[in-house]
């Protein structure tokens, strides 16, 4: 279509294929010339592309006629998995609201959990851990939404503050499957205009089986930039605007006509109603919300024209939109089909022009699900709900998705361009369509504006949109599907008793049984036939006859025959006559989408195959894999360039959607970027890459291209091949239509188009256990537009005659059968040599394997090899008289495939299926010279499970006219008539010697209800073997008394063909019976191949005694203590390792220590003076490492300094722990990726540059003045993120541990076979070619024994230190646990039940235990964490196991970690029984090194000289003391730099071990911080154990005096006067201690906001200075039996309130201060400013723990506005001081405060009503009152005067004077 000329397939065709129909080929060329642009005829472009030759080690046939060979015959089905979602809610900040009581709820699916309620704060601190367990298929589980909401808690109806949503898939796709220390942005779903509602700091992790959780350090509690650390994936913008997601549903077609209601079916039966029995509606789900359309009654082709509108922040944290079509039922609705659209595939997150918003369609979505039968009960309903692969087409739906950014802020501009493009109608559609679309858009815009005015919530809206009844009749094109069945074999006997036929369908076309109406063209089969054009044009100018094509989508039913040699399989005799199917379907012409996908997929396939080829080159150690890799990348660049040049032309397509254009641009831009990278790799621009790195980069390219291949907008539905038994569907294969699509341009053609592809049919739905193949079908399929129909037969194997369905049809129809008249006789030789790594099918953990080899209609079986997982058959199976039809050259290029199935033979019952593989035979024709083929491994698969490898090769030999005598001769058979594999095919063997180290067996479980007591190990390889001695009593000593043995065996010279080595352990029982206990098979021996070691001679030449004497002399001369080298030798440390030699002055070497990286970012200031190679210089200014005598004094000095610095905090082991934690955290911050390979520091350089936890002031001084002798440095230890074994290769440097398996292997436990492990074998192997002359063999001692300690019992003192645990799984219903420790070692069990820690998931144990043990009997240490229960048995939370023996004997010296500094006493006292000089002397002796020689200022080992300070000055006496311990310790830390024998020695450390529970295998149940020390009893006794008991929190009392308030806002208004006032009082408490809230008295009627209080609050609390946290111990609720302890930052809350008499008090403002870090107070009320307070920098903040006493003004705020100021004084005293100098609360004794001098207006109305009248009325209005009073008297006088005047006058007149 686009004319990209990647002539891969064409070139091959031209190289030597004989075409059946040359005219068709010519006409195809003509068609191509007519249709394509002139550039398409450029021939040379094809040369850019290399041949698609098969590059796998399996010899496969040429891919010209057949599709690429796939050895995996079945895809695995979707399996349920266990997942654990762990969420830690740390704290919230900036929550919106006033005086809120926030509580956090977490909802995942139907599960809901809730945190505790925090009172009266907008910044609550929780630090609570929640765990959710889910089981289900990954793909569906990852759509679950985690919804975290923060509510304001009320007794009735909590109020939502804000919420946050993210789906599990987004979390799982993060590095380490987790978000760590991130801030979730909270928004109000009810009103999206209100913006941010606060931030919630949390960790979210999603862990599957076997996933390892990477721990991240908790960041400090200081003010961190929240906006820069939001909980969003990398690459997302920090500000996410709101957006509307429109999902427009136009119509659906071809839905299954089914109604789930019984009455509907009854009605149909009686009335004969032919209406569509389906009432469809669509449900769209996104981001945890769901909207549904209206129901269209009785309609299989419904039209909705409705849009579902979601509102979500963009980009969303939920990946998929779920579209589900339902059938409404009277009882319940039934899902018809489900489809998911991944937003990542319809958008691009990149910035700039490259990025585009999610956009989709309008495009059809093809729906798949269960078979379209109209049965009432659907057995496969799960498929319709999206579980598993759909087995049938269930209609299609026309959908459009668009996104509109709502925010009017700056973000809109970023997306506006894309949005406009999205809104524009497609110009490629005709004008009618454009108008309709435009109208729809306008209407939609109008509606959406209306809607936004109506509601701003995130509620889903569903509304109709106006479009013409028909959007635009998309231009349908007719496609022809043609298929020819070449082989149908391996048909299961159960379904082979009825006639078998095959049906091929695409959509509902071709589906004759239950297809329903044909959608698309809406034509009946008859009318469709009439319109068809002649397809196959005569090439010789004959007139083409326009005869319609009948539809033939099903082969003729035929009764199958029984396969020769295997009654379980039947076959259909398609020998000379190959049945064909063909039919026409009608679909929208958007095949350009599939063409682009095919081009990209071919690029990805080619690159992947090339990478595999390079890997093979590396395996067989051939030269120049680098050059090959560069060639591969060059080819990739040329292919990409060809694609880009075509894509940049942006060819005009009909029916192109916005997404089509955007995707095409994205594809070429991505390829352009990849090309640039590939060029950089070829030219090695940035840095020189190794081959492995180049392969890794190329693999990334493949993954990127594969992502682009997947086309979200469907076009032609998938093709289904169904096998019908008596018209009943029994098995199917599903093929993507793009793989079959034809294009005149070779590069755009589907990879299986016009090729014979082998399909293994599978039954629909869940597969039964032990299922095998249903049928093997070889079918040729071709799908393409009718205009290309002349090419349907082009690639068929030549030599056929086309047989038409009816004689009158002419020759222009597709044939109904292909007749291959030519036949040839072949012989197949199956050379079955051996297999390895098979699945265990018997209860004893072994199998009795045999193989069935099936070829065409023949099957043969190998002999059974009993009781093995690595059988060697060495058998040749001969298949004679095989008749193959067709051209002989075609058969040579594309032979039929051989299927090998492996079974386990059982005495009772049928054989058990172990797996299968597919191979292509090597063909040799009669006229070719014979060359013996090479054996190679074929991978075996049992379903999705890897089932081992088969070493075999298959030859297909053409029988010449002279008969079988003309074939290469075979070796004569043995007595049982079994032919061996010919000698010229068998591998070339050499004599090897296998040395075996037998150490012992461990952890043996019961076998057949009896304990193992007398085990023996049997080693077997290549038919030879050796037995160990029998252990006489496993209980007393599980080690073998004879340590080593050897045997000789003939092994292939090619290392890749080496047979497996099997380890079997048997138990000898009474009466000479033996029982197999367990087995282990080593499939790859390469790890045990030993090269002949030349360096052995020099090592033995070294005089082993001389260095010892020298050392001892020099020691006596220089060291007063006399560290003698001849001290007791524990049996350890005897192994050599090659390490690069360091520079002469080793100590400052920059070589890194990967595992030590966490603690070693800086070089040590203390060691810097020692680095100079000065021998006898006087001591420098630097702080000396004190020798033993003065160390007590130095410890005192340390104590003093620390006490001055950190609130009388005594230096102890925890000081070292917190310093190490801080160091580790800083190292991770500097190196966030945590690259272990970082090489900037050494353990000896880090040992001292450490700050103490609580203080920062001195840290800076340490950095600035590293040599300041006034400041001591804390020693630190190494804190490992994982267990110690993972850092030191499991301590398997001297012996390896092999797990012995027993019992059947199942797919469920693959990879985590914990239940099958019956015990462990400890030993090792050394394999090397046998020396030619026997004299050169080692005399006496075997090579493998050199350096191995004796394995007699050793008594050891073991100290186990348990520091803390974190993230334990909750064991109680309330989501907490009461953990305690149980330790088991042999028969010793220590239960620490009394010391359980109540209600805690992150307990600090600080416990140490001492056990005496005897190795090897008691060598497995188990540490279990139990949950303490008052009633019932205690529950196990998790356990971890440590093999102490491996550590004890390891050359890494894991018995006691080397400390960073040498000291005699104090917190860092030397723990080991041997001093550093003694350890060094012993290491040199064991490794036969010359030395150590001690000289002043240096130590010499061989030719290495280590310089450093050895003379120290005693401060008190000014005496000089000589000590070599410090320098010796430094040498030990650099031991890995010693040439040949050096290795890393274990430093003082804490390991973090994961805890597991047997009921949840592979799922972490928490982590444990601990370490183990071991001391042999034959050495001097060690000192007392380290005291790691937890620090007790220190008691403090905070005295807060509230003096005055100013400018408090006035809330009340006088009803008479309108004057504002407030009745002010202040409330205060420490966060977490809300029960101890304290209030001042009320300052009534404050008219200015001023309040006078003179009121004292007293807050006693417990505090840990090192952790800067307050410890709160309280009962969780009234029903709790025990108090729980929690740690929280010490935060003081002060609030100002307005007192109300009749209603609840009014909240006016709050002030929260972290007592560790709060802004300085203002000196006056005027200077007190809210902005200054909130924006105070860390440097200006102060700590009450340093200042002790602070007084000043601080601001109150409400909704981020200043609402008042308070003058307060804070005074911090310790509990002891508070007891000595107590003060009274409020204004009470002792030390009472004076009453405040309040204004006269301050009083209560109720208490003093007259005062109230006086002050509020009389004082303000007295003149008005007086005037009013006078006026009233005057008025009364006047009234009385007027009233009495007439009477008086009349009386006067009458009476007279």
Swiss-Prot record:
GO cellular component: membrane
Residues that hold Ca(2+) 1 according to the record: 842, 848, 904, 906
UniProt biased composition (Polar residues): 448-459, 1113-1129
Biased composition (Basic and acidic residues): 37-53, 426-447, 1178-1189, 1226-1245
Key words, A-Z: Calcium, Membrane, Metal-binding, Repeat, Transmembrane, Transmembrane helix
Entry binding sites for Ca(2+) 3: 1372, 1427, 1429, 1435
Subcellular location, principal: membrane
Cofactor field: Ca(2+)
One MF annotation (Gene Ontology) recorded for this entry: metal ion binding
Record: residues binding Ca(2+) 2: 1372, 1378, 1427, 1429
Ranges where the C2 domain occurs: 65-181, 225-356, 810-937, 969-1099, 1338-1457, 1578-1729
Keyword Cytoplasm carried by entry: no
Cytoplasmic side: 1-1824
Region called Disordered, residue ranges: 15-63, 426-469, 1101-1148, 1161-1203, 1224-1246
Biased segments, Basic residues type: 1190-1200
Ranges that cross the membrane: 1825-1845
Extracellular side: 1846-1857
Swiss-Prot/TrEMBL GO biological process terms: positive regulation of gene expression; response to bacterium
Location(s), subcellular: Membrane
Entry similarity comment: Belongs to the ferlin family.
Protein name per UniProt: Fer-1-like protein 6
Lineage: Eukaryota, Metazoa, Chordata, Craniata, Vertebrata
Underlying gene: FER1L6
């Amino acid at each position: 279509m686009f004319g990209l000329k990647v002539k891969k397939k064409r070139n091959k065709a031209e190289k030597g294929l004989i075409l059946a129909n040359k005219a068709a080929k010519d006409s195809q060329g003509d068609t191509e010339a007519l249709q394509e642009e002139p550039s398409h005829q450029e021939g040379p472009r094809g040369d850019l592309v290399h041949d698609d030759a098969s590059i796998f080690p399996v010899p496969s046939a040429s891919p010209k006629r057949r599709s690429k060979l796939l050895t995996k015959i079945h895809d695995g089905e979707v399996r349920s998995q266990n997942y654990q979602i762990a969420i830690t809610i740390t704290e919230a900040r900036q929550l919106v609201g006033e005086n809120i009581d926030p509580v956090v709820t977490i909802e995942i699916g139907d599960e809901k959990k809730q945190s505790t309620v925090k009172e009266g704060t907008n910044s609550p601190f929780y630090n609570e851990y929640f765990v959710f367990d889910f089981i289900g298929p990954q793909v569906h589980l990852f759509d679950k939404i985690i919804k975290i909401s923060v509510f304001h808690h009320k007794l009735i109806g909590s109020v939502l503050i804000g919420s946050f949503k993210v789906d599990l898939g987004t979390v799982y796709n993060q590095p380490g499957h987790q978000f760590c220390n991130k801030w979730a942005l909270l928004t109000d779903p009810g009103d999206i205009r209100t913006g941010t509602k606060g931030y919630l700091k949390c960790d979210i992790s999603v862990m599957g089986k076997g996933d390892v959780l990477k721990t991240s350090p908790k960041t400090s509690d200081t003010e961190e930039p929240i906006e820069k650390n939001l909980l969003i994936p990398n690459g997302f913008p920090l500000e996410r605007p709101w957006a509307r997601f429109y999902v427009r549903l136009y119509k659906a077609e071809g839905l299954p006509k089914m109604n789930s209601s019984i009455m509907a079916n009854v009605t149909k039966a009686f009335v004969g109603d032919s209406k569509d029995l389906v009432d469809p509606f669509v449900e769209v789900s996104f981001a945890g919300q769901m909207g549904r359309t209206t129901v269209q009654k009785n309609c299989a082709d419904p039209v909705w024209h409705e849009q579902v509108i979601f509102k979500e922040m963009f980009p969303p944290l939920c990946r998929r939109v779920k579209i589900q079509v339902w059938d409404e039922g009277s009882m319940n609705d039934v899902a018809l089909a489900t489809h998911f659209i991944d937003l990542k595939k319809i958008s691009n997150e990149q910035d700039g022009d490259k990025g585009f918003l999610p956009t989709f369609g309008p495009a059809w979505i093809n729906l798949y699900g269960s078979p379209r039968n109209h049965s009432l009960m659907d057995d496969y309903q799960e498929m319709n709900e999206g579980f598993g692969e759909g087995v049938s087409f269930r209609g299609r739906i026309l959908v459009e998705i668009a996104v509109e950014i709502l925010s009017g802020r700056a973000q809109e501009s970023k997306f506006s361009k894309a949005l406009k493009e999205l809104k524009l109608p497609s110009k490629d559609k005709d004008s009618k369509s454009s108008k309709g679309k435009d109208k729809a858009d306008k209407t939609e815009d109008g509606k959406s504006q209306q809607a936004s005015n109506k509601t701003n919530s995130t509620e889903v809206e569903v509304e109709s949109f106006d479009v013409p009844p028909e959007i635009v009749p998309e231009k349908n094109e007719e496609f022809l599907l043609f298929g020819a069945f070449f082989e149908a074999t391996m048909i299961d006997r159960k379904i082979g008793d009825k006639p078998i036929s095959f049906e091929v369908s695409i959509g509902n076309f071709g589906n004759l049984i239950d297809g329903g109406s044909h959608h698309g063209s809406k034509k009946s089969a008859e009318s469709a036939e009439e319109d068809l054009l002649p397809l196959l044009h005569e090439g010789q100018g004959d007139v083409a006859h326009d005869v319609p094509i009948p539809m033939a989508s099903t082969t003729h039913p035929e009764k199958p025959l029984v396969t020769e040699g295997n009654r379980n399989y039947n076959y259909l005799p398609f020998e000379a006559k190959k049945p064909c199917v063909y039919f026409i379907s009608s679909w929208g012409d958007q095949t350009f989408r599939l063409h682009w996908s095919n081009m990209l997929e071919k690029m990805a396939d080619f690159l992947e195959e090339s990478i595999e080829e390079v890997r093979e080159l590396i395996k067989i150690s051939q030269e120049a894999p680098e050059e090959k890799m560069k060639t591969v990348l060059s080819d990739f660049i040329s292919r990409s360039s060809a694609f880009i040049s075509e894509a940049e032309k942006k060819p005009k397509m009909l029916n192109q959607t916005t997404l089509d254009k955007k995707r095409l641009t994205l594809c070429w831009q991505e390829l352009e970027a990849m090309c640039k990278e590939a060029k950089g790799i070829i030219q090695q621009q940035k840095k020189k890459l190794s081959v492995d790195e180049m392969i890794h980069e190329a693999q990334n390219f493949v993954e990127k291209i594969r992502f682009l291949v997947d086309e979200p907008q469907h076009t032609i539905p998938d093709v289904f091949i169904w096998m019908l038994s008596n018209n009943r569907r029994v098995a199917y294969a599903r093929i993507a239509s793009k793989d079959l699509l034809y294009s005149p341009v070779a590069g755009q053609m589907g990879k299986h188009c016009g090729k014979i592809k082998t399909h293994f049919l599978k039954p629909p739905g869940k597969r039964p256990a032990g299922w095998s193949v249903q049928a093997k079908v070889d079918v040729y399929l071709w799908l393409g537009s009718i205009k290309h129909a002349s090419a349907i037969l082009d690639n068929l194997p030549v030599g056929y005659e086309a047989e038409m369905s009816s004689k009158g049809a002419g020759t222009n129809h597709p044939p109904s059968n292909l007749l291959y008249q030519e036949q040839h006789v072949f012989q197949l030789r199956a050379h079955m040599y051996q297999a390895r790594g098979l699945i265990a099918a018997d209860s004893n953990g072994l199998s009795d394997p045999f193989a069935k080899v099936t070829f065409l209609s023949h099957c043969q079986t190998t002999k059974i090899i009993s009781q093995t997982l690595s059988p060697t058959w060495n058998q040749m199976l001969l298949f004679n008289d095989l008749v193959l039809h067709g051209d002989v050259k075609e058969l040579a290029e594309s032979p039929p495939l051989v299927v090998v199935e492996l079974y386990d033979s059982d005495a009772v019952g049928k054989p058990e299926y172990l797996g299968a593989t597919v191979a292509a035979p090597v063909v040799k024709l009669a006229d070719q010279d014979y060359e013996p083929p090479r054996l190679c491994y074929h991978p075996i698969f049992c379903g999705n499970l890897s089932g081992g490898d088969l070493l075999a090769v298959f030859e297909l030999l053409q029988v010449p006219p002279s008969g079988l005598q003309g074939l290469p001769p075979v070796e004569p058979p043995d007595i049982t008539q079994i032919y061996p594999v010919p000698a010229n095919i068998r591998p070339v063997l050499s004599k090897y010697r296998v040395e075996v180290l037998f150490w012992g067996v461990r952890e043996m479980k019961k076998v057949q209800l009896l304990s193992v007591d007398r085990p023996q190990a049997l080693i077997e390889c290549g038919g030879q073997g050796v037995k160990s001695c029998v252990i006489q009593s496993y209980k007393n000593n599980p080690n073998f008394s004879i340590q080593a043995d050897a045997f000789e065996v003939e092994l292939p010279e090619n290392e890749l063909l080496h047979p497996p080595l099997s380890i079997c352990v048997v138990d000898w029982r009474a009466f000479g019976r033996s029982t197999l206990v367990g087995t282990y098979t080593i499939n790859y021996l390469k790890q045990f191949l030993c090269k002949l070691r030349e360096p052995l001679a020099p090592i033995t030449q070294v005089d082993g005694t001389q260095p010892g004497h020298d050392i001892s002399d020099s020691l006596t001369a220089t060291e007063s203590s006399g560290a003698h080298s001849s001290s007791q030798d524990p049996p350890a440390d005897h192994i050599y390792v090659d390490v690069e030699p360091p520079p002469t002055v080793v100590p400052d070497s920059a070589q890194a220590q990967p595992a030590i990286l966490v603690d070693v970012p800086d070089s040590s200031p203390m060691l810097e003076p020692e680095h100079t190679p000065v021998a006898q210089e006087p001591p420098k200014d630097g702080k000396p490492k004190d020798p033993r005598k003065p160390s007590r004094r130095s410890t005192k000095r340390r104590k003093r300094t620390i006490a001055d610095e950190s609130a009388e905090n005594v230096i102890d082991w925890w000081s070292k722990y917190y310093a190490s934690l801080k160091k580790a955290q800083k190292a991770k911050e500097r190196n966030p990726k945590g690259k272990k390979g970082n090489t900037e520091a050494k353990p000896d350089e880090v040992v001292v540059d450490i700050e103490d936890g609580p203080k920062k002031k001195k840290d800076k001084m340490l950095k600035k003045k590293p040599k300041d002798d006034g400041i001591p440095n804390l020693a630190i230890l190494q804190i490992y993120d994982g267990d110690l074994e993972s850092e030191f290769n499991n301590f398997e440097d001297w012996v390896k541990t092999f797990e012995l398996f027993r019992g059947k292997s199942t797919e469920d436990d693959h990879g985590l076979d914990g239940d099958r492990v019956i015990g462990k074998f400890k030993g090792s192997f050394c394999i090397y070619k046998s020396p030619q002359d026997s004299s050169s063999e080692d005399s006496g001692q075997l090579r493998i024994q050199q350096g191995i300690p004796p394995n007699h019992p050793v008594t050891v003192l073991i100290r186990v230190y348990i520091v803390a645990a974190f993230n334990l799984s909750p064991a109680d219903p309330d989501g907490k646990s009461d953990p305690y420790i149980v330790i088991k070692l042999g028969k010793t069990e220590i239960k620490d039940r009394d010391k359980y820690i109540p209600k805690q998931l992150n307990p600090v144990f600080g416990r140490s235990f001492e056990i005496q043990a005897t190795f090897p009997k008691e060598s497995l240490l188990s540490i279990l964490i139990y949950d303490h229960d008052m009633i019932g048995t205690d529950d196990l939370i998790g356990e971890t196991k440590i093999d102490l023996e491996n550590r004890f004997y390891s050359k890494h010296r894991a018995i006691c970690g080397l400390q960073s500094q040498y000291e005699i006493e104090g917190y860092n006292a030397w723990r080991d029984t041997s001093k550093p000089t003694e350890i060094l002397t012993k290491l040199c002796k064991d490794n036969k090194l010359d030395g150590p020689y001690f000289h002043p200022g240096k130590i010499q080992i061989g030719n290495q000289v280590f310089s450093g300070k050895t003379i120290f000055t005693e401060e008190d006496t000014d005496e000089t003391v000589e000590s070599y311990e410090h320098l010796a310790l430094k040498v030990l830390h650099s031991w890995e730099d010693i040439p040949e024998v050096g290795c890393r020695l274990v430093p003082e450390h804490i390991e973090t071990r994961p805890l597991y529970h047997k009921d949840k295998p592979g799922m972490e149940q928490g982590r444990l911080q601990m370490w183990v020390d071991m001391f042999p009893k034959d050495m001097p006794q060690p000192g007392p154990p380290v005291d790691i008991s937890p620090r007790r929190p220190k008691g403090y009392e905070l005295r807060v005096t509230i003096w005055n308030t100013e400018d408090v806002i006035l809330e009340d208004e006088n009803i008479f006067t309108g004057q504002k006032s407030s009745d002010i009082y202040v409330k205060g408490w420490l966060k977490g201690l809300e029960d101890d809230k304290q209030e001042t008295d009320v300052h009534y009627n404050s008219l200015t906001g001023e309040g006078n209080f003179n009121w004292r609050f007293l807050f006693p609390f417990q505090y840990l200075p090192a952790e800067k946290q307050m410890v709160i111990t309280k009962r969780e609720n009234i029903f709790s039996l025990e108090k729980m302890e929690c740690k929280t930052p010490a935060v003081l809350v002060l609030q100002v309130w307005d007192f109300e008499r009749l209603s609840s008090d009014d909240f006016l403002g709050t002030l929260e201060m972290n007592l560790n870090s709060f802004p300085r107070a203002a000196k006056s009320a005027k200077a007190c400013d809210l902005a200054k307070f909130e924006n105070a920098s860390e440097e200006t903040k102060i700590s009450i723990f340093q200042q002790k006493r602070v007084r000043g003004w601080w601001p109150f705020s409400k909704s981020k506005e200043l609402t008042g100021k308070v003058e307060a004084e804070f005074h911090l005293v310790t509990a002891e001081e508070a007891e000595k100098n107590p003060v009274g609360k409020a204004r009470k004794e002792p030390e009472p405060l004076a009453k405040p001098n309040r204004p006269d207006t301050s009083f209560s109305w109720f208490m003093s009503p007259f005062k109230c009248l006086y002050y509020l009325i009389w004082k303000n209005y007295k003149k008005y009152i007086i005037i009013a009073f006078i006026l009233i008297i005057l008025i009364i006088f006047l009234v009385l005067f007027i009233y009495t005047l007439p009477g008086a006058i009349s009386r006067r007149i009458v009476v007279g004077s």
